[in-house]
Amino acid sequence: TPLQPKYPGDGAPVEDLIQFYDDLQQYLNVVTRPRF
C-alpha cells in the first residue's frame, strides 16, 4: 500500500497543492480499489 500523501500546508505553492491532490487521487484509487 502506498503511503498517504502529506498535505503541504496552506502556505504551500499552488504547484505543491496541485501535486498533493494529484497524488492523493492516485492514493485513494489504490486504497479504495476492491481486493478480490
From Swiss-Prot:
Highest rank taxon of the organism: Eukaryota
CDD domains: PAH
Entry similarity comment: Belongs to the NPY family.
Listed InterPro entries: Pancreatic_hormone-like, Pancreatic_hormone-like_CS
Task of the protein: Hormone secreted by pancreatic cells that acts as a regulator of pancreatic and gastrointestinal functions.
Name of the encoding gene: ppy
GO molecular function: hormone activity
Protein name per UniProt: Pancreatic polypeptide
PTM-bearing positions, type Phenylalanine amide: 36
Key words, A-Z: Amidation, Hormone, Secreted
Entry's localization field: Secreted
Main location: secreted
PROSITE patterns: PANCREATIC_HORMONE_1, PANCREATIC_HORMONE_2
Keyword Secreted included in the entry's annotation: yes
